[in-house]
Amino acid sequence: MNVLPAASQPLNQSVTLCVDAPMRLDSGLELGPLTVAYQTIGRLNAERTNAILICHALTGDQHVIGPHPVTGRPGWWETLVGPGKTIDTDRYFIICSNVLGGCLGTTGPKEINPATGKPWGLGFPVITIGDMVRAQALLLDHLGIERLFCAIGGSMGAMQVLQWAVSYPERVRAVVPIAGSWRHSAQNIAFHEVGRQAIMADPDWNGGDYLNQGTVPRRGLAVARMTAHITYLSEPALQSKFGRKLQDRASITYGFDADFQVESYLRHQGANFVKRFDANSYLYITRAMDYFDLAAEHDGVLARAFQGTKVRFCVVSFTSDWLFPTAESRAVVRAMNAAAADVSFVEVTTDKGHDAFLLDEPEFHDTLQGFLDGAADMFGLPRGLFSGIRP
């Protein structure tokens, strides 16, 4: 077993914010106090200029590296983050927070509503990607970080980092949106609606009050996960891994058990997911993604969202990603070009589908490495291990 040096050991913490004044949400409602759970890795340099914010995807959380507290599995981006890796914890100070509305420590529908002493459930206000980013900005205030070196995220994380560039352009030097888009498509909203309806149709959902009723809508949440997981893959990857191979049997059973390996795989994904994720959080976070549209506040003209920005961008897409296809990333790049923004674009050739950003994909890793090294050199960040603080 490889033991990480002390500076690269993850620190898992939480902080209560907005104690004196609530945070105003995009809906017009207010929320506070709110708790943000987060992980940090590495050391913040004396100038506080080497911080990277990693934004997680829909079903992710703050545990980028290290054993997950619920599943015991490795962190979701250990392929990329660590000493000497692409996102080098000897050089950068890494922050990742559980998003607002999440279910691993940050205020969300699973947590206790201080006004009632019971879980929020559907009493929790509907949130947006903008609200998630607003909470992250408050966390950075708490950590004493005025400006990020870089914000990086895939899928829903890409939405967050783009929102960072639009809402707080003066607080981030570089942004890397991976396998994302500037708005959620009709097809993706449709897939989310199928998942939400599966959850809400489960009798154990109890109108969203299942935690107070002592039930969990496991079946509905599992189906939602199974449906969504298909969109994270690709037909070539499914064909290569499963094809029409049978699951532990010599012939079909003429029944409705999992005859095919792909059926068994999806059932396994659903069963594992319900052990670590909250059903109401799934409703709220998918809705936040559906509402995401960077052009909405700019008369439908995306380029205006990036007008005058000094942020340096690297936009990454994958050839086999049909959830957020390359055309979506190209639209973002064209808008940035129209706004005279500093942007690089790379389409990575892979058959691994949308989830390629989570996997061992050398071309993607090399792309990210090159961009980070170039940006770090431009902004004067030193290479190698240095002493610093762990706020």
Swiss-Prot record:
The active site is at S155, D321, H354. GO terms for biological process: homoserine metabolic process; methionine biosynthetic process. Its EC number is 2.3.1.31. Pfam families: Abhydrolase_1 (PF00561). It is found in: Cytoplasm. Pathway: Amino-acid biosynthesis; L-methionine biosynthesis via de novo pathway; O-acetyl-L-homoserine from L-homoserine: step 1/1. Its main location: cytoplasm. GO terms for cellular component: cytoplasm. The keyword Transit peptide does not apply. Substrate binds at R225, D355. It catalyses: L-homoserine + acetyl-CoA = O-acetyl-L-homoserine + CoA. Residues 50-360 form the AB hydrolase-1 domain. Keywords: Acyltransferase, Amino-acid biosynthesis, Cytoplasm, Methionine biosynthesis, Transferase. One of its GO terms (molecular function) is homoserine O-acetyltransferase activity. It comes from the Bacteria. It is an enzyme of class 2 (transferase). Homodimer. PANTHER family: HOMOSERINE O-ACETYLTRANSFERASE (PTHR32268:SF11). Belongs to the AB hydrolase superfamily. MetX family. Transfers an acetyl group from acetyl-CoA to L-homoserine, forming acetyl-L-homoserine. This is Homoserine O-acetyltransferase. The lineage of its organism: Bacteria, Pseudomonadati, Pseudomonadota, Alphaproteobacteria, Rhodospirillales.
